[in-house]
């Protein structure tokens, strides 16, 4: 098992298969709330489901309403269990993650997206501003 330190944004712990995207993701328009399926123009993950995954993306694109879409994914049971980004996430996404109890980590000390593939089992833990990413193996 490999451990990587990261900056913690939203506290919590979760584990699941990684869903790795090469583009920025917006919960406002890129993800279908009713199904959790990625429907936006994201070629690396188009038609994949975010449900139960640890999302690993370069960054998030948000808007004033993005928090509501992430929270609605949670209410429908179609939410990711955690989010890891290369850079700080959009504030609206952070707001939605707080409401939905989805841990967020950013700025990992090692580039996670280049290290693992979609489907690899990943666990995260965030306490305060400290985060740990544990790469557990294939899911």
Model features per residue range: what roles?
Residues 131-139:
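Phosphate/diphosphate-binding glycine-rich loops and adjacent basic-rich segments that engage nucleotide
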Residues 3-12, 19-132:
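Feature captures the catalytic cores and cofactor-binding loops of soluble hydro-lyases/lyases
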